[in-house]
Amino acid sequence: MKARLPPLLLLPLFLPGLAIAAPSGRDIVLHGNANGALPCAACHGANGTGNPAIGAPALAGLPAGQITAALANMAQGHGGTTLMRSIAAALSPAEAAAVAAYFAALPKP
């Protein structure tokens, strides 16, 4: 008698190939995300030096936890500008953490 595996038991073998990798922090900073978050670099710069003329603070070298907390706060509608609140709301927690890690790893201006 041959043993047969139910087809559902084979599914995990194929799932890794179907997984879609989340964009890196650098990708989000440079290109935004699929949920409508604009590229951070448009205002904060790819190197995180900010743009005082438009009120975009420097983010390079800040602690990742500080950036993540600020994004979470803005995603809840508190602080920041209307534009930043909408961008923060379009980031998943993992994407916000990736963006924060990217900026935290950059040297302070």
Which residues does each predicted region cover?
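Sequence context surrounding c-type heme c attachment/ligation sites in exported
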Residues: R26-A41, A64-T68
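Positively charged n-region of N-terminal signal peptides that target proteins for export
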Residues: M1-R4
